[in-house]
Amino acid sequence: MRSDAIKKGHLKAPNRSLLRACGLKDEDFDKPFIGVANSYIDIIPGHYFLNNYAKIIKDEICKNGCVPFEFNTIGVDDGIAMGHEGMLYSLPSREIIANSIETVMNAHQLDALICIPNCDKITPGMLMGALRVNVPTIFVSGGPMASGVTKKGEKISLSSVFEAVGAYEAKKISEEEFKDIECSACPSGGSCSGMFTANSMNTLCEAMGIALEGNGTILALSKEREELLRKAARRICEIALDERFKIRNIITQKAVRNAMVVDMAMGGSSNTVLHMLAISREAGVALDIKDLNFISSKVAHIAKIAPSLNSVYMDDIHKAGGVSAVMAEISSRQGHILELDALTITGESLKERLKNAKIKDENIIRKVDNAYSKVGGLAILFGNLAEQGCVIKTAGIIGERKFKGKAVCFNSQDEAIKGIIKGKVQKGNVCVIRYEGPKGGPGMQEMLSPTSLLMGMGLGADVALITDGRFSGATRGLSVGHISPEAAEGGLIGLLKDGDEIEIDVDAYTIHANVSEEEIAKRKKEFALPQKEVSSRWLRMYQKLVSNASKGAVLDME
């Protein structure tokens, strides 16, 4: 056993003495030691109950002949961190989470790992850390919350509240309606109820085979979710010493491809691109941002979920057959785009896992021949504005897929929010928000507040927004993010001026500023990078080491 390094032989008597102080007995030193990586924190609605979930898992591990050791990671709630300096810390928290998993697991030489993530950066951070450790691993998330319901009977989610801010600013809803939306949107614990970043990543864990069926869709705080926890705990005990189930044997090239196929079919958050690039790097798997358009071109978009379709939420997907039904439909209709021989954590191939899966409600999960789109719900655009690529969630577009407009430039998200409220962005404009990339922020803030303001003010179908920052999974509209190279590293987005004409053609995968080469060269000579004081030592370190978004915004030591 890997854990023999801390428990076997007379030289390890001091180690055992410390473990005895934690309650271990003689017989425990012959059992596998299993790390239970929790992410319990009171301030995140998807995490405040995870202390109880960890207890369920630990009790089951003990019943099945292993010894659990719980430890915790930090967590940041992107919704609560939104709209102030706290958002600078969201993406960097992914690296801290990855480092903490690696540190605890390797410092104590634990044999296997079960991770309990749920929201935002916690799932990808745990995946990255687990891949570094490379022991048998299972992920079991806390689960999505139920959708909210207003007094009028309308189903809503957190994204509805962000958009209500814009509607209230524009005097389109009353104060009473505004309050009702605020108080109704998040009715329970769990990750926010739509296909936002948290649910996207928990769904992709299922697609990659590192989680059991239902991981992405079974509601939080339900009896069914508790049973999933117990199943995961029993399974980690069964495989704790089986090298076939080391996480790098599960998250392979095939698994990463399967994740991106499901991402396209379900219209996942644009953040998944950033995270899957980082995860594939830790797995030693090749994933180039340029490959994603090929996958998208081969995968129909068959499940549309809030915020793209505000009548459908994760619990609806679960009732309609879940992620397995989506994968089964894609595999039966779209050739060999899914790698069906990929190994899952149950020991089954993906093909075996899907053999009984079927769509139970074609109004929720469509057949391929009735898809929302013949291509996937994400696209990568290239052009002089994004030579290394940028990302758009095509599933969230509510207007035209081709757009031409005049730039209105802002050098920060805060500046953009003020400008939008003051009416500086009008129909037909392209709202440009720059110096918000991984280095420029630093931290690559999400632009949910500006996109939601535009949507709530009735401009969502008539304005494009481009940024070197990123978006919440709750964003919709013609919103292009992750522009690389970013402004802080000399990207063309930093040279744009108000009135420059910008063309976006989603179906041609292009984004272009209609500025002559001579004018660009002139602006480069005159350009001076705006100086931004960064008082945080951690953020200065992050700024110095982080790559741009086209590489996953990872800390690059090379």
UniProtKB/Swiss-Prot annotation:
Cited PROSITE patterns: ILVD_EDD_1 (PS00886), ILVD_EDD_2 (PS00887)
Entry keywords, A to Z: 2Fe-2S, Amino-acid biosynthesis, Branched-chain amino acid biosynthesis, Iron, Iron-sulfur, Lyase, Magnesium, Metal-binding
Annotated EC: 4.2.1.9
Enzyme class (EC, first level): lyase
Modification N6-carboxylysine occurs at: 121
Annotated residues for binding of Mg(2+): 78, 120-121, 446
Pathway(s) this gene product operates in, as recorded in its UniProt entry: Amino-acid biosynthesis; L-isoleucine biosynthesis; L-isoleucine from 2-oxobutanoate: step 3/4; Amino-acid biosynthesis; L-valine biosynthesis; L-valine from pyruvate: step 3/4
A GO molecular-function descriptor: magnesium ion binding
Catalytic activity: (2R)-2,3-dihydroxy-3-methylbutanoate = 3-methyl-2-oxobutanoate + H2O; (2R,3R)-2,3-dihydroxy-3-methylpentanoate = (S)-3-methyl-2-oxopentanoate + H2O
One of the GO BP terms on file: isoleucine biosynthetic process
Cofactors that this protein relies on: [2Fe-2S] cluster; Mg(2+)
Active-site residue list: 472
GO cellular component: cytosol
NCBIfam families found in the cross-reference section: ilvD, PRK00911.1
Summary of the function given for this chain in its UniProt record: Functions in the biosynthesis of branched-chain amino acids. Catalyzes the dehydration of (2R,3R)-2,3-dihydroxy-3-methylpentanoate (2,3-dihydroxy-3-methylvalerate) into 2-oxo-3-methylpentanoate (2-oxo-3-methylvalerate) and of (2R)-2,3-dihydroxy-3-methylbutanoate (2,3-dihydroxyisovalerate) into 2-oxo-3-methylbutanoate (2-oxoisovalerate), the penultimate precursor to L-isoleucine and L-valine, respectively.
Assembly description: Homodimer.
Protein name: Dihydroxy-acid dehydratase
